[in-house]
């Protein structure tokens, strides 16, 4: 195991990962954030350098952590040789097996290999698989012709809005998610539409892997074109900063899939896999 701390080498790694799209997108997004101030306190672990076969991004060991916060305790994985990834999994100090955590990636063997090692350590593992999408370059000029009604007030979220997002996110509703969302809003780009009272009615945020997520419109404000406006604006904002505009969508989320198709988003050949690993000590907790 090698922790890559050199800023020059991290920039080189970023370029190397770009040549491995789309499977490397999650790790690439995390490395881009590391190279641009590292607001989420991440670090990179590899099997070797420069001819690596597996690379993992994780929370810095010195960063404050909550053992129940799998949102923040998230690892992104990319490998050229799955055996190298398994070897890193089996090393004692790459993953923190005493806490609830996530593993994210875009490669098909990720679940089976992770499950085999997790089972040997008596951890429960839960898989959720998504369609992975990528936005083509978005015009710098916003098109609002599709909006229905008055032009909305388009702005960004504040930490004060974290509670609303926590309550409306299917993955949320708990203290850990509330804190995580507040950190995402503080660290990364977001977009929202606000009503005449200044309250958010439609929004999307960016996560620690530079992925667009939690796109949501309050039910009473749907069918006005807000979701489309928010998605295009956030994609444009990410692209203007040099980030790929990527996202994930569940197979049964037909409304979001239809929206993405109307935006000409590219559905990638690989799928996004999110694994949540839970030690037996915490297995009875309801929000996990």
Swiss-Prot record:
InterPro entries linked: Acyl_CoA_acyltransferase (IPR016181), Glycine_N-acyltransferase (IPR010313), Glycine_N-acyltransferase_C (IPR013652), Glycine_N-acyltransferase_N (IPR015938)
Catalysed reactions, semicolon-separated: an acyl-CoA + glycine = an N-acylglycine + CoA + H(+); (9Z)-octadecenoyl-CoA + glycine = N-(9Z-octadecenoyl)glycine + CoA + H(+); hexadecanoyl-CoA + glycine = N-hexadecanoylglycine + CoA + H(+)
GO cellular component term, pick one: mitochondrion
Keyword hit for Lipid metabolism: yes
Position of the signal peptide: none
Record-level GO BP terms: lipid metabolic process
Listed Gene3D superfamilies: 3.40.630.30
Pathway(s) it belongs to: Lipid metabolism
Major enzyme class: transferase
Keywords: Acyltransferase, Lipid metabolism, Transferase
UniProt EC number: 2.3.1.13
GO molecular function: glycine N-acyltransferase activity
Role played: Catalyzes the conjugation of long-chain fatty acyl-CoA thioester and glycine to produce long-chain N-(fatty acyl)glycine, an intermediate in the primary fatty acid amide biosynthetic pathway.
Family note: Belongs to the glycine N-acyltransferase family.
Protein name in UniProt: Glycine N-acyltransferase-like protein 3
Organism: Homo sapiens (Human)
């Amino acid at each position: 195991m090698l922790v890559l701390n050199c800023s020059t080498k991290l920039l080189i790694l970023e370029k190397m990962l770009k040549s491995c799209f789309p499977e490397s997108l999650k790790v690439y997004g995390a490395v881009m954030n590391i190279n641009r101030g590292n607001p989420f306190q991440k670090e990179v672990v590899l099997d070797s350098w420069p001819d690596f076969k597996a690379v993992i991004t994780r929370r810095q060991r010195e960063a404050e952590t909550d053992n129940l916060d799998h949102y923040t305790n998230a690892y992104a994985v990319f490998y050229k040789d799955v055996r190298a990834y398994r070897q890193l999994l089996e090393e004692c100090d790459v993953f923190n097996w005493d806490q609830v955590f996530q593993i994210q990636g875009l490669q098909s063997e990720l679940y089976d290999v992770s499950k085999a090692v997790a089972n040997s350590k008596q951890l429960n593992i839960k898989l959720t698989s998504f369609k992975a999408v990528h936005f083509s370059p978005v015009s710098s000029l916003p098109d609002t012709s599709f909006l229905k009604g008055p032009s909305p007030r388009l702005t960004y979220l504040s930490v004060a809005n974290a509670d609303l997002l926590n309550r409306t996110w299917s993955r949320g509703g708990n203290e850990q998610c509330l804190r995580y969302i507040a950190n995402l809003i503080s660290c990364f780009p977001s977009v929202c539409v606000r009503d005449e009272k200044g309250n958010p009615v439609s929004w999307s945020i960016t996560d620690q892997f530079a992925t667009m997520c939690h796109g949501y419109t309050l039910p009473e404000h749907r069918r006005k074109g807000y979701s489309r406006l928010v998605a295009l604006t956030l994609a444009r904002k990410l692209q203007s900063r040099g980030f790929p505009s990527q996202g994930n969508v569940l197979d049964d989320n037909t409304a979001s899939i239809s929206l993405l198709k109307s935006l000409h988003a590219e559905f990638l050949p690989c799928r996004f896999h999110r694994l949540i690993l839970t030690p037996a000590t915490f297995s009875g907790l309801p929000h996990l």
